[in-house]
Design a protein with these regions (language model features):
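Active-site entrance/lid segments in N-terminal catalytic domains of soluble metabolic enzymes
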Residues: 1-142
Length: 142
């Protein structure tokens, strides 16, 4: 897949900052995006669930303000990593929050469920699936 133009035009290099469990949060994501790379965080890092919306609003607000103050800067989009496993009872509620705020990129881990892909695509969001092998990549593409 080629990098979509609206992303390519706003990144300094094709890099996604890893969504690190318990580490990645708004401060790191904002810094990454300001540096021109895609910042990301796991939705489950925002605890309790309502904090996810607060994080997304903060990230979007601070990046918009930075872009306004620095119109020539490449400010990359951000991503929310969704753990798509039966043990994640927040998945659909977290996706509702991501859809409400039109998170630019959703990163799925463990499996790419159709309902997550459809939800992200409903507003033009992109879905990247995190895989560890060629076999998993082929399975995700099915």
């Amino acid at each position: 897949m080629a990098i979509p133009k609206h992303i390519k035009d706003n990144i300094s290099m094709p890099v996604i900052g890893a969504p690190l469990f318990l580490i990645s949060g708004p401060d790191l994501v904002i810094a990454q995006c300001k540096a021109g790379i895609i910042g990301s965080f796991p939705a489950l890092n925002a605890r309790p669930q309502h904090v996810l919306e607060e994080w997304i609003i903060r990230i979007k607000t601070e990046l918009a303000e930075y872009q306004e103050q620095n119109p020539d800067a490449k400010v990359a989009p951000f991503a929310v990593n969704q753990i798509c496993h039966g043990s994640n009872d927040r998945l659909m509620q977290d996706m509702e929050t991501c859809v409400k705020h039109e998170v630019p990129i959703i990163i799925t881990s463990l499996r790419p469920p159709a309902e997550v892909v459809e939800a992200a695509h409903s507003y033009g969001g992109l879905v990247f699936h995190d895989v560890i092998s060629v076999r998993h990549a082929k399975k995700a593409a099915e």
